[in-house]
Each structure stands twice: as structure tokens, then as C-alpha cells.
């Protein structure tokens, strides 16, 4: 055996393996950077919407498809930009991190604008006015917000209802991934009350005959579309589309489609009074 040739061959193999590992390492680093910057796996022809599809009538599953007011709104935005809309369904509390990492372009998920959220994202002009409501089982001794002290309260994780419940003295707050899951827990007696946005509360409690929504609002809020902090170009485009939709009637058509004619009339009346 020629030992010199063997050594050279061994050196060549080792050098080749080392080079391969180096290239793989560089590739992994580039992949990570591109993902964080939102530049990997995303085409210029695609607009990625992040949402939490358990919030009817804004976003919910119909068979294998995610539909709702927010979805139709996002489709109009994508169409105006000559882009295809892609929807990423995820937990509500994961939306802003996904926005920051570049996994999604915008979060359209019935998201209320709050000072805390505004620290981590840009927000479009408001597209819907909402409020938080209390839901209880019929016959419950809880009749108003003041009687929530020390009670077991169910909320959807990461929502403004979650924040409100956390401020109630002595409250034992249980967090759930979706609106239907927290109402199911209330119906089963696992919690004594639920704090939830008004429109989903009305939609989902219709399927629970033993539940009722108490009169009175816990808060007044505005939904808006969240965009990554430095993406002012996309923010400007979204605001322009929202303004055009409100002007040409497309926005009213979506309200009528998802909430009914009576809701549209009520909304118009409130606008005139304000």
C-alpha cells in the first residue's frame, strides 16, 4: 500500500467534508437571516395575512377554507396591489411576533388598537368599532362588571378581554385559544363568566341556548390592520384601499354581507350622531 497516497486521499476527504459543513453552515445562517427579514419563501406577488380563525364573523373556518369579514377585506387589499392573498392561521398571541419576524405581512384578525400593541407594530386607520361584553349562563347571579370580583373568568388568550380580566380584583383568569373554546368552557361550568368582543359574542352565543350576553359595554375599541413597524409603504397602501372602499361602497357591502342590513344601518346612524 502507498501510504503517501492514502494520506493524501484521507486529507482530501477530510477537506471535502469540512468544506461541505462550512457551506451548510453559511446556508443555514443565510436562511435564518432571510426568514427574520421576511425575504425567504415570500414572493413579491403574494401578500401574507396572519389571523386566528376562531373569531366569527371576522375569520372562521368553513370546511377547509378560512372565510369572514377580515378575509374579504384582505382580499380587496391584495387585489388592489395585484397580489395573491395567502392566509396563515395561528394563535392570536403569536400574530405580532410573526409580523416582527417577517412570517406575515399584515395581521388582520379583529385586533384592537392599544398603546401596548402600537409599540410593536404600525396600525392602519380603524375599520371597525367594537366593545367588550360579559357573557354568563342564564340565571347567573353575575349581572354587571362589579360582580366579576373574585370570579372565574374565561378569555381568549392575548385579547383585550384578557387584559381587562387581568385588572379585575381577585379574578381567576383562564385563557383559551379561540372564542368558541372559551364559551364551551363557560357552558360546561368551568368558568363563571367570559369577556369577549361584541360581534363574536353575538355570533357564537347563538349556538349556546343556555348562555346570555349582559347589557352594557366594558370598553369601546377600534379594530385595525397591524403591519411591521418599519413598513410604512405597505401601511400607506392599506390606508388608501380602506379609504377607497369606504368611498365607493365596497366596505358597506362587506358589512351588509357579514353582519346584515340592520347592522349597517345602525353603524351609519352612530356615524351621524358622532
Predicted feature descriptions by range:
Residues 86-97, 140, 157-160, 174-188, ...:
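Short helix-initiation/N-cap motifs at beta->coil->alpha
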Amino acid at each position: 500500500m502507498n501510504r503517501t497516497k492514502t494520506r493524501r486521499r484521507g486529507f482530501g476527504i477530510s477537506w471535502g467534508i469540512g468544506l461541505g459543513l462550512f457551506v451548510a453552515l453559511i446556508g443555514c445562517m443565510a436562511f435564518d437571516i432571510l426568514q427574520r427579514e421576511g425575504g425567504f419563501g415570500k414572493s413579491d406577488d403574494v401578500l401574507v395575512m396572519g389571523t386566528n380563525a376562531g373569531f366569527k364573523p371576522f375569520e372562521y373556518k368553513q370546511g377547509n377554507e378560512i372565510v369572514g369579514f377580515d378575509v374579504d377585506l384582505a382580499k380587496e387589499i391584495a387585489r388592489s396591489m395585484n397580489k395573491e392573498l395567502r392566509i396563515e392561521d395561528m394563535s392570536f398571541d403569536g400574530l405580532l411576533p410573526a409580523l416582527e419576524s417577517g412570517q406575515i405581512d399584515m395581521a388582520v384578525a379583529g385586533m384592537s388598537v392599544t398603546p401596548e400593541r402600537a409599540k410593536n407594530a404600525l396600525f392602519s386607520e380603524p375599520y371597525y368599532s367594537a366593545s367588550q361584553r360579559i357573557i354568563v349562563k342564564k340565571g347567573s347571579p353575575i349581572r354587571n362588571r362589579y360582580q366579576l370580583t373574585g370570579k372565574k373568568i374565561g378569555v381568549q388568550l392575548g385579547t383585550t378581554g384578557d387584559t381587562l380580566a387581568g385588572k379585575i380584583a381577585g379574578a381567576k383568569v383562564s385563557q383559551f385559544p379561540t372564542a368558541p373554546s372559551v364559551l364551551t368552557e363557560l357552558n360546561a361550568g368551568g368558568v363563571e363568566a367570559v369577556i369577549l368582543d361584541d360581534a363574536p359574542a353575538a355570533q357564537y352565543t347563538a349556538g349556546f341556548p343556555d348562555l346570555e350576553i349582559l347589557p352594557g359595554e366594558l370598553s369601546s375599541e377600534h379594530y385595525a390592520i397591524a403591519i411591521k413597524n418599519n413598513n410604512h409603504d405597505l401601511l400607506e397602501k392599506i390606508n388608501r384601499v380602506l379609504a377607497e372602499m369606504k368611498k365607493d361602497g365596497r366596505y358597506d357591502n362587506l358589512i351588509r354581507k357579514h353582519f346584515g342590513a340592520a347592522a349597517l344601518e345602525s353603524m351609519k346612524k352612530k356615524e351621524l350622531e358622532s
